[in-house]
A protein has these predicted regions:
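Short, flexible helix/strand-to-coil boundary loops that buttress conserved ligand/catalytic motifs
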Residues: 4-7, 139, 166, 210
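Short glycine/proline-enriched coil/turn segments at helix->beta-strand junctions
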Residues: 116, 186-189, 202-205, 219-226
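Accessory nucleic acid-recognition modules appended to NTPase machines
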Residues: 53-195
């Protein structure tokens, strides 16, 4: 909603997750009334809505993002940690690899081979990138948070980074899940990785993230479940438009 205000002057309210899950049809209708179709604005946000310098020119946006990443890895991180130039280059390579991942439980040993490092060092690198707020490491609620516990999913910090970094073309599932996790965690919600479904919110609400035809089958076994769907303007029942997560506070 902040992006819509800054770029277009639309002043729309923000909502809690509880308000969205209870009243998503009414909320989506009120947004659609003002925007006609929210989906083109949503696609814009996914490409260049996460940082305020989109107003300085969209051609420069991706270049500015790359500059910020390089500055964080080349200057900020070495000031805080003892990091070699070789490690800096591997951190950059790791970000590129993550940008092109299909969302799934990563094979950490295979990732380490790709980055030309060892498994323990790769886990430490993932921790460093998470501390720098460049990635989000999603962990299982049952395994606990430990540096040596591999994350169940690794996503970049926001969708703009995915689109800016991926050279082969991004995976739509990666974009969707990155956006969802970004918005949910920014709203202060606790998100862990469930055995089925994509996200477990506050250890009780099971969330599945997908396209507009995404079925409820993966999460239907769980009493408290919702599907957030892309390409959907107005939802129904437990099927909620994904873009509504952009109105969380």
């Amino acid at each position: 909603s902040e992006f819509l205000k800054l770029k277009y002057g639309f002043d729309l309210p923000a909502y809690t997750f509880e308000e969205i899950q209870s009243n998503h049809i009414e909320i989506a209708r009120s947004i659609k009334q003002l925007l006609e179709s929210p989906l083109p604005y949503f696609q814009e946000f996914l490409s260049y809505g996460s940082y305020p310098f989109f107003n300085e020119g969209l051609e420069e946006y991706s270049y500015r993002l790359q500059q910020i990443l390089n500055f964080i890895i080349d200057y900020d991180l070495p000031e805080a940690k003892d990091i070699s130039v070789s490690t800096q280059n591997k951190l950059k390579k790791l970000l590129y690899v993550i940008s092109e991942l299909v969302p799934f439980t990563p094979n950490v040993s295979k990732l380490a081979t790709q980055i030309e490092t060892t498994r323990p060092i790769l886990l430490e690198m993932l921790h460093i990138l998470e501390e720098a707020r460049l990635i989000r490491n999603l962990r299982s609620a049952t395994k606990g948070i430990s540096l040596m516990n591999k994350p169940e999913k690794i996503l970049l910090s926001n969708a703009n980074l995915v689109k800016s970094l991926s050279e082969k073309g991004w995976n739509s599932g990666n974009i969707r899940e990155t956006f969802a996790l970004d918005q949910l965690q920014n709203a202060g919600l606790t998100i862990t990785h469930p055995s089925k479904g994509d996200f477990l919110l506050n250890e009780e609400v099971l969330l599945e993230i997908g396209g507009k035809n995404k079925a409820l089958t993966q999460v239907a076994h769980h009493e408290n479940h919702f599907v957030f769907s892309d390409e959907l303007e107005i939802g129904w029942g437990k099927q909620i438009p994904l873009y509504l997560l952009g109105f969380l506070y």
